[in-house]
Amino acid sequence: EDYDVVFPSEYIIERMLRKDLLLPIDTAFGKTPNYLKNVSPYIVEQIDATSNHGRIAHNYAVPYMWGTCGILYNKVHVPQKDAQTWGTLWNRKYRGKLLMKDSYRDSYGTALIWEHRKDLAAGKVTVPELMNDYSPKAIAIVERQLKALKPNIEGWEADFGKETMTKGKAYLN
């Protein structure tokens, strides 16, 4: 199938570039404003980290959203101070009240970031290094952390989290 526009995540952009599935963005917008110049240089640098085979990612993809992995919480049930750390997800007082993203990278990253929080704070490791660590040790850590998290999980979701939270079935997402 041919598509004019797709909305893949950054790691899928990398795969699509590698498999030659993307065309360069046609910047001849005519009278339509060119918003590409308004993208933060920092974000362009981050998307360009996925460049490969001589293709610069920002010539093929426009970052339209940034920082989608965070903690959504119901302030009636979760104090703001609790929601400031990934550790809240493992807190037993939220047993059965957590919705986890049905996203491999979000779950994997959350588990590794929590496990390595002290090393991250000390500058011994970076988030990109953790996110790209698929060693047996990293996988074992993620498995252990997700198993520890299991009692708190109400369900796994991709799109219905806000609705479930407004019904009071979950307090964290």
Name each region found by the language model.
Residues 8, 57, 66-68, 95:
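Extracytoplasmic
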Residues 14-66, 80-87:
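Hinge/lid segment of periplasmic solute-binding proteins
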Residues 77-84, 116-122:
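Short helix-loop capping/hinge motifs at secondary-structure junctions, enriched
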Residues 97-100, 107, 111-173:
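Ligand-binding pocket segment of bilobal, Venus flytrap-like solute-binding proteins
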Residues 1, 13, 86, 161-164:
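Short, hydrophobic alpha-helical packing/hinge segments within bilobed ligand-binding/sensory domains
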Residues 68-80:
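Hydrophobic/proline-rich hinge and linker segments of small-molecule sensing/allosteric domains
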